[in-house]
Design a protein with these regions (language model features):
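Nucleotide and nucleotide-moiety/phosphate-recognizing core
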Residues: 5, 9, 54-100, 119-122, ...
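Interhelical loop and helix-boundary elements at the membrane-water interface
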Residues: 12, 16, 21-66, 94-110, ...
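Membrane-interface helix-boundary signature
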Residues: 52-55, 79-83, 141, 162-168
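Loop-to-transmembrane alpha-helix initiation sites
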Residues: 125, 141-149, 160-172
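Alpha-helical transmembrane segments and their immediate juxtamembrane flanks
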Residues: 162-190
Length: 223
């Protein structure tokens, strides 16, 4: 792969990764600037907290899709190495998007899943499933993201991925952990916010402080 090909694939991946779906969709449908609420990131998890599950689902699919599109272009152009180069560009674009003035984007989790879907499909599916299971079990999106990203490199290796693909996913895992450093600090202090899962048939959200206080003050009736 020539230097020119590397540069072109990296730029193409970056432009695709820069599409800030979380910002655009939440702005269009809710009027909110997702960068001004919650974690201030444009990723799907922050969208879920402040725009609902349907919006989360759409943003997650689009963020996965842009990672897959970048990797697919790289794969078609220069094989697995090209997929890695374009995929890396997509991650950088999601983190510091061109269309938001190179300012803060997302934490690259969904886009990493999208790239992995092309270079290691089975590993990508397992990563996504693991993310969901950890989220349901702990209700911490940060714990789910860190756990799933750490599992990805060995999964890629287990499913027969090449060393460039393993190295790419290892680098992505390190980047994801670094982007969650504030979350890690809050977890260590016990101040990280749990995620309220409001889905049909799944009511694992914690009671509000007022409801909890009311429950604790409730006494049995006098007979």
């Amino acid at each position: 792969m020539s230097l020119l090909t590397i540069v072109l694939l990296g730029v193409a991946g970056y432009v695709l990764g820069s599409l800030p779906w979380g910002y655009w969709l939440s702005r269009f449908f809710t009027g909110k600037d997702i960068r001004e609420v919650g974690s201030r990131g444009t990723g799907a998890a922050n969208v879920w907290r402040h725009a609902g599950f349907k919006m989360f689902f759409a943003v997650a699919l689009l963020d996965i899709g842009k990672g897959s599109a970048a990797a697919a272009i790289g794969l078609a152009t220069a094989g697995p190495s090209g997929a890695v180069v374009a995929g890396a560009g997509a991650l950088v674009g999601h983190w510091r998007p061109l269309f938001l003035g190179f300012k803060r984007g997302g934490k690259i989790v969904a886009t990493t899943v999208g790239v992995a879907l092309v270079i290691a499909p089975l590993a990508s599916v397992v990563m996504a499933a693991l993310w969901w299971m950890v989220l349901v079990a702990t209700r911490y999106t940060s714990v789910a993201s860190i756990t799933a990203s750490l599992a990805l490199p060995p999964l890629v290796l287990m499913f027969g991925g090449s060393w460039p693909e393993v190295a790419f996913t290892a680098g992505a895992a390190i980047a994801i952990i670094a982007l969650h450093r504030a979350n890690i600090e809050r977890l260590m202090r016990g101040t990280e916010n749990r995620f309220a899962l409001r889905l049909p048939g799944l009511h694992r959200h914690a009671p509000t402080p007022i409801a909890a206080a009311a429950a604790s003050d409730r006494t049995p009736p006098v007979r």
